[in-house]
Amino acid sequence: LPIYNRKKLPKEIKIPEISKIKETKNTIVLKKFIESNFKDHPGDTKKFWFPTTRKDANKWLDEFMKERIKLFGDYEDAVTDKSNTVFHSALSPLINLGLFTPEEIIEKLRKVEGKIPMNSLEGYIRQIIGWREFMRGIYQNYDEHLEKNNFFNHKRKMKTNWYKGNTGLHPLDHA
């Protein structure tokens, strides 16, 4: 059987860039607050790149539908140094923030049904409903249990190289 969503990314393929969004005044204020109150937490506000308004979020969704959804299915699991997102939408955080509902994204997808490959349509719907919403349901219903349970009985803490991206495992460090 042919494989439709596990293709290796060709070297010559051009991966569309995700548009940079101009920061809002509120984003600037919040970044300063985070920098002064959460200095010991992992992460860096200088690398923040997500839209924080409905208008900008819609631009991202439209851009995904025009530039990346067609090849999403083929390269859904591809790993490369060329891009952090490859042909993914990067919309999940925007759903988490309430800028979209999963239903809105599915409705947009239905409008391009028949115009994009089935593996992209099915693959993306599976990502939104089959994985993202399933995991959301797990967290909503079992959050306290998951926080307290140590199913594998792990004892060691994560080393700082996991947070700093210098594990020696190239795909992990690049992520």
Task: Give the location of each predicted region.
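Active-site-proximal binding-pocket segments
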Residues: 90-91, 95, 99-175
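Active-site "lid/cap" and pocket-lining segments within catalytic core domains
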Residues: 1-108, 115-118
